[in-house]
Curated annotation (Swiss-Prot):
<feature type="domain" description="EamA 1">
    <location>
        <begin position="3"/>
        <end position="128"/>
    </location>
</feature>
<keyword id="KW-0812">Transmembrane</keyword>
<keyword id="KW-0677">Repeat</keyword>
<feature type="domain" description="EamA 2">
    <location>
        <begin position="139"/>
        <end position="274"/>
    </location>
</feature>
<keyword id="KW-1133">Transmembrane helix</keyword>
<keyword id="KW-1003">Cell membrane</keyword>
<feature type="transmembrane region" description="Helical">
    <location>
        <begin position="202"/>
        <end position="222"/>
    </location>
</feature>
<feature type="transmembrane region" description="Helical">
    <location>
        <begin position="233"/>
        <end position="253"/>
    </location>
</feature>
<keyword id="KW-0813">Transport</keyword>
<dbReference type="InterPro" id="IPR004779">
    <property type="entry name" value="CO/AA/NH_transpt"/>
</dbReference>
<feature type="transmembrane region" description="Helical">
    <location>
        <begin position="81"/>
        <end position="101"/>
    </location>
</feature>
<dbReference type="GO" id="GO:0005886">
    <property type="term" value="C:plasma membrane"/>
</dbReference>
<dbReference type="Pfam" id="PF00892">
    <property type="entry name" value="EamA"/>
</dbReference>
<dbReference type="InterPro" id="IPR000620">
    <property type="entry name" value="EamA_dom"/>
</dbReference>
<feature type="transmembrane region" description="Helical">
    <location>
        <begin position="256"/>
        <end position="276"/>
    </location>
</feature>
<dbReference type="GO" id="GO:0016020">
    <property type="term" value="C:membrane"/>
</dbReference>
<keyword id="KW-0472">Membrane</keyword>
Length: 299
């Protein structure tokens, strides 16, 4: 849980840094290439093939390609149509995707209690960030929702792989980032604009921060933390970046939030986490234990 909180704080800076200094100034495909390329370099020394099948390695590369490669390309394009606050608002459905996709991948019945606690988190984040949207609303909304879905598929896929095809996390992430990097290379050569390269030391510095710290270290901590909690808690924590991102905007760019809705929304998100951990998760575990006991008795 602590790793998820630390990463949320770290990522709160990423949204604003990219939106303020890179979006519209640096080619989005090049930004993705540098970001995942630097992250891949961080874990390159841990790349191992011994003891792992090609299928397992390929699956870890696939989830990396989805969670980082494709997700970044979609979300970075969305910055061209949305403000930072709008983009934050449109990510609030991610907990629902995470919870439902995990149930689908696990081939289990949909747990509506998990969906309910995730929906509370969605409501809380929506309270914080609901405001007037720009004319490019629909395009931006579509891009962000596709980004949310690919992020959820990658995150849940990684969690499932750790459950069914485990390997040391640092080895897994070497393949994870390699998959994302291959997607970014292909996208850059096919769609990139070489005329929109970083022009200032600040822009290069932000790219290095996003690649090494936010992606390289941040995603390792997030996905490692994801393996330590249930899918419902994971989905709710994913929405904590909304109040965290707003606090960063307040501290650095002095963008004042509407305090009544900010406090109300943050309390709803925290309440959703408390409700989930107090009632929903224990009840789901008890139900699963009862089913296993019934099956054992019937045998």
């Amino acid at each position: 849980m602590a790793l998820l909180i630390i990463t949320t704080i770290l990522w709160a800076f990423s949204f604003s840094f990219y939106g303020e200094y890179l979006a519209g100034h640096v080619d989005s495909y090049f930004a993705v290439l540098v970001r995942v390329g630097l992250a891949a370099l961080v874990f390159l020394p841990f790349l191992r093939t011994r003891g792992n099948s090609l299928k397992t390695v390929g699956l870890y590369m696939l989830v990396g390609a989805m969670q980082l490669g494709v997700m970044y390309m979609l979300s970075f394009r969305a910055y061209l149509y949305l403000t930072v606050s709008e983009l934050l608002l449109f990510t609030v459905l991610t907990p629902l995707y995470i919870t439902l996709i995990y149930d689908i991948m696990s081939k289990r019945r949909l747990r509506w209690g998990y969906a309910f606690s995730a929906l509370l988190a969605v409501i809380g984040a929506g309270i914080i960030r609901y405001d007037q949207v720009t004319d490019h609303f629909w395009t931006g909304l579509l891009l962000v929702q596709l980004s949310n879905i690919t992020f959820a598929i990658g995150m849940v896929g990684y969690k499932r792989l750790m459950e069914t095809r485990p390997m040391p996390q640092h080895n897994a992430f070497a393949w994870f980032y390699l998959g994302a990097f291959l997607v970014a290379v292909i996208a850059w050569f096919l769609l990139g604009n070489a005329q929109k390269m970083p022009q200032t030391t600040l822009q290069w510095g932000i790219l290095v921060f996003l690649g090494v710290v936010a992606s390289g270290i941040g995603y390792f901590m997030w996905n490692y933390g994801a393996t330590q909690v249930d899918a419902g808690t994971l989905g709710i924590m994913n929405n904590m970046h909304v109040p965290a991102g707003l606090l960063v905007n307040l501290a650095i760019w002095h963008q004042q939030p509407h305090w009544p809705t900010f406090i109300t929304g943050a309390l709803v998100i925290l309440a959703s986490l408390w409700v989930h951990r107090k009632w929903v998760a224990p009840r789901s575990s008890q139900t699963a234990d009862d089913r296993r006991r019934d099956c054992a008795l019937s045998e």
